[in-house]
């Protein structure tokens, strides 16, 4: 699979007169370095755990690690490594969804009432950090992504725990579909039978109330659920034919 990637990239480079920059040896070296980085990060405990814990770049669990299992499907990442990813990311599961990472202030409690921009500039980041209420991170739609990833690992490992995880997170994902007369985290109505980007918290008088993000419906979350349901359907058919 990696060799196909290299040959395809070299062909495109040549077509765009960039082939002087690339070579098979160079690309294979870069691919190997990439795999070394992934395995090192996982052995250290997560996404970017090589920093001091007080460093803002330090991070163990990050939902983006699921990319290692799907859709990247990296040929040199074995089942044991994929199991590591699932165990790390599972720590981010909250009552309503999966956090991107701990202390993620984007769409955290009261985000939509604090006149905070979603921009990535330094001032916007600083304002979000100042208004962040601990343990109120947005919980994203990634349950469908996790369910599909767990199903993939179950097929490879045949370990019952991953089959159970795939069913559990599929059900969690389905529970994220909005019902009738729901109010979003910005205080406005949201459509029913729709998938939001995440579930957010509203903090009032010391109490937390969950509500769907006003970013709804989201094609990304719909696509992720579609891929999950297809994976689970295939899994059920495979199990039934045994």
Q: What is each stretch, according to the model?
A:
Residues 4, 8-141, 155:
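Extended ligand-binding clefts on enzyme/binding-domain cores
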Residues 24, 81-82, 159-166, 238:
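Solenoid-repeat scaffolds in large eukaryotic assemblies
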Residues 131-139, 172-242:
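CBM-like carbohydrate-recognition segments
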Residues 28, 65, 143, 215-218, ...:
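Residue-level detector of extended alpha-helical repeat arrays and alpha-solenoid scaffolds
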Residues 126-172:
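Extended, compositionally biased non-globular segments
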């Amino acid at each position: 699979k990696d060799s196909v990637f290299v040959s395809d990239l070299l062909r495109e480079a040549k077509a765009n007169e960039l082939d002087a920059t690339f070579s098979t040896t160079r690309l294979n070296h870069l691919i190997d370095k990439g795999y070394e980085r992934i395995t090192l990060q996982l052995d250290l405990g997560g996404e970017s755990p090589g920093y001091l814990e007080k460093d803002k770049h330090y991070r163990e669990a990050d939902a983006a690690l699921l990319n290692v299992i799907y859709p990247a499907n990296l040929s040199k990442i074995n089942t044991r490594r994929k199991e590591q990813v699932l165990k790390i990311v599972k720590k981010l599961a909250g009552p309503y969804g999966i956090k991107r990472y701990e202390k993620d202030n984007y769409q955290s409690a009261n985000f939509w009432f604090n006149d905070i921009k979603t921009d990535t500039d330094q001032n916007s980041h600083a304002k979000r950090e100042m208004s962040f209420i601990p343990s109120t991170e947005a919980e994203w739609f990634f349950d469908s992504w996790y369910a599909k990833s767990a199903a993939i690992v179950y097929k490879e490992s045949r370990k019952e725990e991953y089959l159970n995880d795939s069913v559990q997170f599929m059900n969690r994902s389905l529970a994220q579909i909005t019902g009738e007369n729901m109010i979003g985290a910005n205080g406005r109505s949201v459509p029913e039978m729709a998938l939001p980007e995440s579930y957010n918290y509203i903090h009032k008088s010391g109490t937390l109330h969950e509500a769907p993000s006003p970013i709804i419906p989201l094609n990304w979350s719909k696509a992720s659920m579609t891929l999950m349901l297809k994976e689970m359907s295939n899994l059920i058919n495979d199990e039934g034919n045994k």
